[in-house]
A protein has these predicted regions:
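Bacterial N-terminal signal peptides that target proteins for export
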Residues: 1-10
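Bacterial N-terminal signal peptides
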Residues: 9-19
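Short, well-ordered, aromatic-rich surface patches in folded extracellular/luminal domains
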Residues: 22-56, 115-236
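N-terminal secretory signal peptides
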Residues: 39-84
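Short amphipathic beta-strand/extended segments with alternating polar/hydrophobic composition
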Residues: 65-69, 88-93, 136-147
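Acidic/histidine-rich, surface-exposed loop or edge segments in extracytoplasmic proteins
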Residues: 74-89, 187-191, 205-209
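Short, surface-exposed linear segments at secondary-structure transitions and domain or protein termini
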Residues: 75-77, 96-102, 147-158
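A short-motif feature that recognizes glycine-rich, charge-decorated loops
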Residues: 77-113
């Protein structure tokens, strides 16, 4: 009887120990898997967004804002008069141009502690703002005119993108509502292309090809569109 009782107690202890060990291993295993899953699910730090804004009353346009994302070709622009309804439109900026823009912003310390304005009595050229946003981090700097070469390079790119989108908007309006005026719009595009002010003129190729192939437009306009498209492809 005593022997049987002793064996029963021993078996009970072994079973309890085995169950406890399995629970610990199981808990450990699930904790490890959970941690791995959490690490895999945790999003990478969000890419930065670079924004340029210019407000220049009594000019045309009075308001320009362009936002470019570090991790995406998708960007947005808003070009209008101040009295117009606000609303951004999507467009694309290549990875190469974005890399250059963000490199310039980094050289400006992401606009932290920067004083870019020339601080001289000169004409009002419009209030310009550079803004860096990345998660909770936000920095911006405002200026009228700057002599900082790095800031000037970044400004030239942003203003070039704005002018590029303005011209594309003009071409699209003429295509829809004023086909006889298409050649004048193409001349404006050609002038800016000659001045090398358009950062990515290849963005206009689909529009130029459409004009060149559409018999509803005047021949001189179609030929100019064809020549511009050929020139841009050759330069690219």
């Amino acid at each position: 009887m005593r022997t049987s009782l002793g064996r029963l107690i021993l078996l009970t202890c072994v079973a309890a120990l085995t169950s406890s060990s399995a629970s610990v291993v199981g808990a450990s295993g699930y904790a490890s898997i959970g941690a791995d899953s959490a690490m895999r699910a945790a999003p990478a730090s969000a890419g930065a967004t670079l924004t340029f804004r210019r407000i220049f009353k009594s000019s045309s346009p009075e308001f320009i804002e362009i936002s470019v994302r570090e991790d995406s070709d998708e960007a947005s622009y808003e070009i209008r008069q101040l009295d117009d309804d606000p609303g951004a439109t999507k467009f694309e900026v290549s990875s190469g141009l974005r890399a250059r823009m963000f490199a310039l912003a980094q050289q400006l310390n992401r606009f932290q502690g920067q004083d870019l304005d020339v601080h001289r009595k000169i004409a009002n050229l419009g209030e310009k703002t550079f803004r860096w946003e990345q998660g909770p981090e936000t920095h911006e700097v405002k200026f009228n005119y700057t002599l900082n070469s790095t800031a000037s390079q970044l400004l030239q790119i942003f203003e070039g993108l704005a002018r590029q989108q303005e011209l594309l908007m003009l071409l699209e309006r003429r295509m829809k509502y004023d086909r006889l005026g298409i050649n004048d719009a193409l001349l404006q595009f050609e002038t800016e292309l000659n001045r090398k002010l358009l950062p990515e003129p290849e963005r206009a190729l689909p529009t130029l090809d459409q004009i060149a192939g559409d018999s509803r437009f005047v021949d001189i306009g179609r030929q100019r569109a064809r020549n511009l498209a050929e020139r841009i492809r050759h330069q690219s």
